[in-house]
């Protein structure tokens, strides 16, 4: 299984993994060296797909899609790093509060 990238660009934002424990990760999100916010995610396992025409997409780890935020992903403003860190800790404990 291909692991989720530690840095990637999506929709004009640069995502950088700050920490990861198991299938939970904390990413910064922004442009260049400016951080606009943080995202705590539960990483998905995406199975191999075979497309029409025979192209194969190997099994890989995936980022939650837009519809999964609030369930598998949480966004925090730039000033909310403490809240993002707390959510990261909570998710690494299986969603249990401190």
Q: PLM ranges: what are they?
A:
Residues 46, 82-84, 96:
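Amphipathic alpha-helical interaction segments
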Residues 33-40, 67, 83, 98:
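Short linear motifs in intrinsically disordered/low-complexity regions
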Residues 1-62:
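Short N-terminal "domain-start" leader segments
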Residues 63-83:
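A short, exposed loop/beta-hairpin motif centered on an aromatic-Gly-Thr core
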Residues 1-3, 90-98:
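Short intrinsically disordered terminal tails
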């Amino acid at each position: 299984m291909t692991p989720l990238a530690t840095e990637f660009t999506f929709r004009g934002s640069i995502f950088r993994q700050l920490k990861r424990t198991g299938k939970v990760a904390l990413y910064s999100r922004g442009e260049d060296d400016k951080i606009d916010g943080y995202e705590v995610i539960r990483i998905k396992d995406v199975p191999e797909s075979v497309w029409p025409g025979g192209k194969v997409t190997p099994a890989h780890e995936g980022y939650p899609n837009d519809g999964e935020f609030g369930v598998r992903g949480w966004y925090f403003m730039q000033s909310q790093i403490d809240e993002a860190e707390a959510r990261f800790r909570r998710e690494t404990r299986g969603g249990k509060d401190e």
